[in-house]
Amino acid sequence: MAKGKDARVIVLLECTSCVRNGFNKQKKPSGVSRYITQRNRHNTPGRLELRKFCPYCHKHTIHGEIKK
């Protein structure tokens, strides 16, 4: 039986270094890396931060949760 609201929610993760650096001012393709994932509201009540690969920065960076 279902118990109220669903615990799992879909969240968007966005590269924090791309946003901070102003979308790479070099002659590379500009953009912001984003990932879609799920998190359990009961286990992680705060904002989610994961270390993922950013194709625009060409390295692993911290991706933070953003609002939809």
UniProtKB/Swiss-Prot annotation:
A GO CC term attached to the entry: ribosome
Entry-linked HAMAP family: Ribosomal_bL33
GO molecular function ontology, one term from the record: structural constituent of ribosome
Source organism superkingdom: Eukaryota
Organism of this sequence: Piper cenocladum (Ant piper)
One GO process term, biological-process aspect: translation
Keyword S-adenosyl-L-methionine applies: no
Subcellular location: Plastid, Chloroplast
Pfam family, one: Ribosomal_L33
UniProt-listed InterPro entries: Ribosomal_bL33 (IPR001705), Ribosomal_bL33_CS (IPR018264), Ribosomal_bL33_sf (IPR038584), Ribosomal_zn-bd (IPR011332)
The protein's name: Large ribosomal subunit protein bL33c
